Amino acid sequence: MSVIGSKSCIFSVARYTRENEKSSCFTSINKKSSLDLRFPRNLAGVSCKFSGENPGTNGVSLSSKNKMEDYNTAMKRLMRSPYEYHHDLGMNYTLIRDELIVGSQPQKPEDIDHLKQEQNVAYILNLQQDKDIEYWGIDLDSIVRRCKELGIRHMRRPAKDFDPLSLRSQLPKAVSSLEWAVSEGKGRVYVHCSAGLGRAPGVSIAYMYWFCDMNLNTAYDTLVSKRPCGPNKGAIRGATYDLAKNDPWKEPFESLPENAFEDIADWERKLIQERVRALRGT
């Protein structure tokens, strides 16, 4: 792996130290000012793999920088997210559970080699639409081809970026694919969208909520404490409601209290699990 002999970092927010402020995988913005809060390289929780020997902005084209700026502007406006995606730093990811990794898009076949060799990834769940892949100039065919060569199952469940209603509608099928891959037990599942800050965390939180005996807040806090991000909790609540109350006489979700379906009864969880598993292969 010629390019994968690159820098990688492992970190969590819990042990953040001032002397490591210059090592960055994400940038968060303080409410009052544009403080550049950097995440350190030497902590457990999040692993960020850089695709170049010297990641940074020096070798980034103006076109690429404009794309990142436009994308991060849209993310702030539509998701009210203080986080930023830096495509030029390469693929980054976080081990959420032993069987589950959440991250940004693989950018080249060498990233697939890295996931296989370093993280024992056996399944990749891609939540991007075709237009997302085209926007970032990713050669998906080469990535899928490398997955096949390495025996990695590549799955797609597209959802529209920055769109809670799209995420809500696609969550059941996406979680169905994720839960199936986990149940196969052949290796870790890598769930990604473009930045790994919205759709991929949302699907992973829904999976933990519906299948790991957690309420929504516990599942949400578990993920964001390891990977700082801003997935839409309302989309997960809405999808939970859609699955648990699948009847024509149900009251509109919009009329329910703000915290509705942040927890479910055991019988509702079993019903949701049955309905999600029934979506396998659809």
Swiss-Prot record:
Q: What is its EC number?
A: 3.1.3.-
Provide the effect of R153A: Decreases starch C3 dephosphorylation. No effect on phosphatase activity with p-nitrophenyl phosphate
Binding sites annotated in the UniProt record for substrate: 83, 153-156, 161, 177-180, 194-199, 230, 245, 251, 259-263, 268
**Which segments constitute the Tyrosine-protein phosphatase domain?**
92-249
Please state what is observed when this gene is inactivated. Answer: No visible phenotype under normal growth conditions, but starch of mutant plants contains high levels of C3-bound phosphate.
Motif Glucan phosphatase signature motif CXAGXGR: positions = 193-199
Q: What is its induction behaviour?
A: Expressed with a circadian rhythm showing a peak at the end of the day and then decreasing to reach the lowest levels at the end of the night.
Q: Which SUPFAM superfamilies match?
A: (Phosphotyrosine protein) phosphatases II (SSF52799)
Q: Per its database record, what is this protein's job?
A: Starch-associated phosphoglucan phosphatase that selectively dephosphorylates the glucan C3 position. Probably participates in the regulation of starch degradation.
Q: This chain belongs to which protein, by name?
A: Phosphoglucan phosphatase LSF2, chloroplastic
> Source species, please?
Arabidopsis thaliana
- Gene name tied to this protein: LSF2
